[in-house]
Structure formats: C-alpha cells, structure tokens
C-alpha cells in the first residue's frame, strides 16, 4: 500500500487476503498442537505448583519427572522456526516501506514516518520479549524474570497497542 499504492488493489486479490489471514492461524495451530501433543506424552510426579503468570511451556516442563531436554529442544526449534520465517519477512517489508518513504517529498516523508513508525516499534518490542522468553539458554532460565517478561508481552504491549498504532 505504501510502496505501490496504485497497484495495491490489483496485488491484494481476495485469494491472497484469505491466505494472509488463514496462514498465521494454521501456523499457530501447528505450533500449539506440537506443544500440546508433547505435553500429553510426559510423566508428571503428583500434585505440583508452579508460579507463572500463565501456563507456558517452560514452567510447565519443570513439573515433569523425566528428562525434558528433547521437549525443551522442541520449544526452542519451534520458536526459532517461527522467528526465522516471520522475522525476516517483516524486516524485508519494513526495508521496502522505508525505501518507498525515503523517495517521498520531505512533507510526505514526515507525515508517513509519524503514521508508520509506531508499527515497527510495537513489532520490535513484541518480538524482543518473545525471543527473550523462548530463545535463550536454559542456564540463564529464571521463572521470576520470565514471569515479568510474560506479563509485559501478554498485558502491557496489547494495552499500549491502541496508543502506539
């Protein structure tokens, strides 16, 4: 829409719009089903209590009585795959948008930057906190720190979204 506004209605066919809506849902479902299927195969040692903000895989795995290295590896691989595929896609689109903005007049550039700069800010904050939670070595794992960060990406970022965007 910013790079080629006159071609937008041609490029964004109904089929592409449906794919762009359905695709993330399918990927999210596959991500969730991977973790859910793995969780049902794990042995648990009686009643235990965890202290997370919400039931996430990392604290959940601390309740397991068996070796969880493969499960932690699966969490890391799935989170890494989501980041590897979606991160560069977003980054490349931002580069194209930035190049289109830099070709505009000074007045148009100023208005466009003031309108569009909030989205990359929200995306980078969100991706940063998610990578902090899911893609870090287990040696630096801290449930209390993860709890603070998870509150940030589940409550603070969505609350700030109307103000940012």
UniProtKB/Swiss-Prot annotation:
An example Gene Ontology CC term for this record: plasma membrane
Membrane-side (Extracellular) residue stretches: 37-43, 94-122
Listed transmembrane segments: 16-36, 44-64, 73-93, 123-143
Principal cellular location given in the protein's record: membrane
Keyword Kinase: no
Alphabetized SUPFAM superfamilies for the sequence: Family A G protein-coupled receptor-like
Membrane topology designation: Multi-pass membrane protein
Cytoplasmic topological intervals: 1-15, 65-72, 144-165
Ion transport is among the record's keywords: no
Stated role: Odorant receptor.
Name of the featured protein: Olfactory receptor-like protein HbA1
Organism this protein belongs to: Apis mellifera ligustica
The organism's taxonomic lineage, starting at the top: Eukaryota, Metazoa, Ecdysozoa, Arthropoda, Hexapoda
């Amino acid at each position: 829409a910013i790079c080629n506004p006159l071609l937008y209605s041609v490029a964004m066919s109904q089929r592409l719009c449906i794919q762009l809506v359905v695709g993330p849902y399918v990927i999210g479902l596959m991500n969730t089903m991977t973790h859910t299927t793995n969780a049902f195969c794990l042995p648990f040692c009686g009643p235990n209590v965890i202290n997370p903000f919400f039931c996430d895989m990392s604290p959940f795995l601390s309740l397991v009585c068996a070796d969880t290295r493969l499960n932690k590896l699966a969490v890391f691989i799935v989170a890494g795959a989501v980041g590897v595929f979606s991160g560069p896609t977003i980054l490349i689109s931002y580069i194209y948008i930035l190049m289109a903005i830099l070709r505009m007049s000074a007045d148009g550039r100023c208005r466009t930057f003031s309108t569009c700069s909030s989205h990359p800010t929200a995306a980078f904050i969100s991706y940063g906190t998610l990578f902090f939670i899911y893609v870090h070595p287990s040696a630096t794992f801290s449930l209390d720190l993860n709890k603070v960060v998870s509150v940030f990406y589940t409550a603070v970022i969505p609350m700030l979204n109307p103000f940012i965007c």
